[in-house]
Amino acid sequence: MRYRLGVDVGGTFTDVLLLEETTGTTFRAKTPSTPADQSIGVLNGIAKVCAEAEIEPSEIGQVLHGTTVATNAILQGRGARVGLVTTDGFRQVLQIARSFVPGGLAGWIIWPKPEPLAALENTVEVVGRLAADGSEITPLDEEQARAQLRRLAGAGIEALTISLINSYANDAHEKQVAAWAESELPGIPISISSQVLPEMREYERTLTTVANSYVQPEVSRYVRNLDRSLQEKGITAPLSILRSDGGLVQSAKAAESPVSLLLSGPAGGVTGAVWFAEQAGYTDFLTFDMGGTSTDVALVLGGEPRIGRETKVGDLAVRATSVDVRTVGAGGGSIAHVPELTKALRVGPQSAGADPGPAAYGNGGTEPTVTDANVVLGYLPAALAGGEVSLDVDASRTAVATIADAIGLGSPEEAASGIVDIVNENMFGALRLVSVQQGYDPRDFALVSFGGAGPLHANALGRLTGAWPVIVPPSPGVLCAYGDATTCVRDESARTMIRAFSDTDDAELRTALAELATSAAARLSAEGVPTEQQTAKYQVDLRYQGQGFEIPVDLDASALESGDLLSTLGAAFDTEHERLFSFLLKNEREVINLRVTVSGPRPDVAFQPLEEGGEDPSAALVSTNDVWMDGEYAKAGIYDRAKLLAGNVVEGPAVITEMDSTTLVLSGHAATVHSSASLLIAPR
């Protein structure tokens, strides 16, 4: 037997899923996250799931991990002290930045500008200059450059970024400075912009490379520690890390380019959602991943997640390929509060996290959270995670009652209903960002819900968006780990090539794209993926001449082989531009960047359809419970999901429980069990 182990570390829980490839049998575990050292929670989960499966850790063939280490380093300001080497005259590139201030009309008054990840006192200039076409204008001055590097060594930097003007067109100067840095700053990790982001725009290229340096020591330490701990537990399987774009990369390479891991965790959920939605027969859908701290949403079209060229974490926005995920601070642990000034109920973004957690957990938490509201409303059973977490209903009522008192409501139930309504609206706003604001009508999509808290709110989100059916995969609380275990190895090559359509031809574009594909394929082959099992996807960034931004246009292999490449690109660009902005221009089109992603094969995981059982779900009925719905109490059936069979129809109001999550079916709706074991919720 061959086992694949998927691991996803969240803000509250660490999810582990063990998958036996030949039968599709899964074993799962959910353990509290350990923020001080994430590897502790990971190892606890692995030990637990191996014991459940009755296997030795040495039988695991692959370990596939979605991590938030890089993300947390950015959010918590725990990154390295970064030194930055720039071209003479560009020392303040990070301070000048871009003329964008968030927060509306008066944002510039109240917005606290974040400090750059590389301080000005740790930024030096070197003499030497390249032109935009890569030709040398001024040669490097070795003596001056070494003196500047020695200055950084004396400043005690922990990581070094080298970002020189126009290095995307010629990396010779950056490589030379890196060679000198290796002798002047031994042991210091070095990131050069022509490798991290070989594209135009010096600010974005510099910022992205500095971010890579900022998180590199932290990620490297974590990967080394986890690798060593796995070895000590008898797991000799290779460790792979999930990239932000949903592909896997070997741990050593991930440590070299950690900026590609900033959305590693959310990408795993989207990848898992694609797998289960395909089994249920849906390829166009929105994803809704609600955990304990935050909610991530994305859009999938034709079975492919939309990929963005910007990754945003907190105030930091870097140019890195990632699944186009939007995040809001709304989770099961989000704290409800009533500001003294406005007396208006708010929910989040503050979270009770894993420690102390919601009041219902009985770990000392006293503030009212979304989880407490669901407990008060009767939507959550008395125990979570298969009975491992008991809920304190009285503590939840006491916590939520403080909200009722603060805003003058008559009962904790009314306050709890208000908390749930507000958090649902917050998440609805995030879903609009990836659908309506991108030119898509959510009513044309299904909605795939997962995460520990997602299925509790999924039916309500379906009602708000009009996206039907709402699909709740099996084991939704560990779906991110399932995505980690069912995705493929991936690599990417990119290049800036600024050409007006009239200044290039099909042959030049085809040659450049082929070179990028060859480069990425070679790196994938080095990781053990046979060439015949590799597939390439092509993307070209286009704009009208004079525009200050580009639109990525996907290009399939058949179009690349056809003789009318520019016409195909132009037509696709016009379609996308009109969808986004509702107009076209007569300006000439212009090629800006080329990008090729090469992927290995998806794992061949067996699928076993669920046994047929007819429409009657009564064999899975465990009990009934009073739930507060539509302003009054109603009787709801409590169902054990493990006992539901294909074809069963659960009519709301109902609560469907399982080890890692709970699904709420509202009045006037019904959940049909699909043969893939997913629940399909729709209005009756």
Task: Label the model's feature ranges.
Residues G61-Q62, T161-N170, N212-V215, A416-D421, ...:
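Conserved short loop/turn motifs at secondary-structure junctions
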Residues S39, V49, S194-R201, R205-T208, ...:
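ATP-dependent carbohydrate kinase catalytic cores
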Residues R4, V9, E143-G154, Y282, ...:
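C-terminal, non-catalytic interaction/recognition modules in large multi-subunit enzymes and RNPs
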Residues V16, R28-A36, G83-G89, S251, ...:
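Glycine-rich phosphate-binding loop of actin/hexokinase-like ATP-binding domains
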Residues F27-K30, P57-F100, T161-E174, L197-A211, ...:
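Short beta-strand-loop/turn "lid" adjacent to the catalytic site in phosphate-handling enzymes
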Residues G6-V9, F13-L17, F27-R28, P32-A36, ...:
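Conserved phosphate-binding loops in N-terminal lobes of ATP-dependent enzymes
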Residues M1-G83, A131, T138-T161, E174-A179, ...:
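N-terminal glycine/serine-rich phosphate-binding loop of ATP-dependent small-molecule kinases
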Residues A159, S163-T209, S213, L555-A559, ...:
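Terminal amphipathic helices with adjacent charged low-complexity linkers/tails
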